[in-house]
Design a protein with these regions (language model features):
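Acidic/polar low-complexity surface segments
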Residues: 112-124, 294-302
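Generic beta-strand structural signal
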Residues: 94-96, 185, 204, 264
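A mature extracytoplasmic/lumenal domain signature
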Residues: 62-64, 72, 82, 103-105, ...
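Hydrophobic membrane-insertion alpha-helices, especially the h-region
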Residues: 5-24
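Glycine- and aspartate-rich repeat motifs characteristic of hemolysin/RTX-like Ca2+-binding segments
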Residues: 143-145, 151, 160-163, 169, ...
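Short linear S-[DN]-x-LW-Φ motif typified by the pepsin-like aspartic protease active-site region
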Residues: 27-106, 110, 126-147, 151-165, ...
Length: 323
């Protein structure tokens, strides 16, 4: 009890000191211990913008979130907390038409005070960290290479191809990919909205995959997540394979030219398909299967000779609902 009392008193004293320090530096603001300078510093955002030479290839080698979008000129804007900028500076270099963005880290170690709250965390995050890259609307990226990436978002662009390993999050909105979109390496959540590509291959171990309002003409498209959920909505595609182990899969209001296979070993499957499409379902004796409003057994099939076919397959623990 005595030790606990001493610890509480010590924490209160430290809190009072930190509050006083923060108040003396322009009011009560979040502060952290900067291990670079070994002193308390006020957490504040800093931003700097650099104009760039022309480039048509981009290498992302940073754990800070990166957004690539159209602008009037080639430039990069980096925003970080001041302490993190000193510890993890971001570098940008254009060489032979390739822009490489390196450095930067969201991690910040130390004690943080926000008001009267004191937190200590070896893996806290610089939530202000971000990198924004703009390219002229008339230009297109030939190659986007992901080396050490965490969050990458593409907006309103034309990109020939993507290579490398996805990190925590990959997003593309209003993007045309000239070549097959290969996102088969990594553990990222993948979000594609209004994306066009000849083919998409998206694979992730733990992330979710969401594809909406997009177009992929290939009949061999692949969306595959080991533990995440998969959603495919309002998308035009030749066909393909959607597969997950533990996650759920939802397909709704898509235009499929040939065959779409939807399979989960332990998750639930939900589909909204055209009234003229053929549908086959395969579950287990423990599965609840509903096909166009009617309860079915472990296997069922309607319109087997239709041009467009949907195949729903689930394992012992999964249910299937098709409307």
């Amino acid at each position: 009890m005595k030790k606990r009392y001493i610890a509480c008193v010590a924490a209160i004293v430290v809190g009072i000191i930190l509050v006083s320090w923060g108040t003396a530096h322009k009011g009560i603001k979040p502060v952290t211990w900067d291990r670079t300078t070994n002193r308390l510093v006020v957490l504040k955002k800093v931003r700097h913008t650099t104009k760039l030479a022309d480039f048509d290839r981009l290498v992302v080698n940073t754990k800070l979130p990166v957004v690539v979008k159209p602008g009037s000129v080639n430039q990069v804007t980096v925003q970080q907390q001041a302490a993190n900028r000193r510890r993890h500076p971001v570098t940008t270099k254009v060489h032979d038409g390739t822009l490489t963005v390196s450095g930067g880290d969201q991690r910040q170690r130390g004690v943080t005070l926000n008001g009267l709250a004191i937190t200590g965390d070896d893996e806290a995050f610089d939530t202000d960290g971000a990198i924004t890259i703009t390219v002229p609307q008339s230009d297109q990226l030939k190659v986007l290479t992901l080396q050490k990436s965490w969050t990458v978002r593409l907006e309103d662009l034309t990109v020939q191809r993507v290579t490398g390993r996805t990190g925590g999050n990959f997003q593309a909105k209003n993007v045309q990919f000239k070549k097959a979109l290969d996102l088969s390496q990594g553990d990222a959540d993948i979000y594609l909205t209004n994306v066009t590509a000849p083919k998409v291959t998206a694979k992730t171990s733990y992330g979710d995959i969401q594809v909406r309002q997009s177009q992929f003409k290939s009949t061999a498209n692949v969306l595959n997540s080991l533990d995440g959920d998969i959603t495919l909505e309002m998308t035009e595609l030749g066909g393909g394979d959607l597969r997950t182990s533990d996650g759920d899969i939802t397909v709704r209001d898509n235009q499929v030219a040939k065959t779409l296979t939807v399979q989960s070993y332990e998750g639930d499957l939900s589909g909204m398909v055209p009234a003229t499409a053929g549908v086959s379902v395969q579950g287990s004796t423990d599965s609840d299967i509903e096909l166009f409003g009617r309860s079915r057994g472990a296997t069922a099939r309607v319109r087997p000779h239709a041009k467009v076919q949907y195949r729903f397959i689930t394992g012992d623990d999964g249910d299937i609902t098709v409307r």
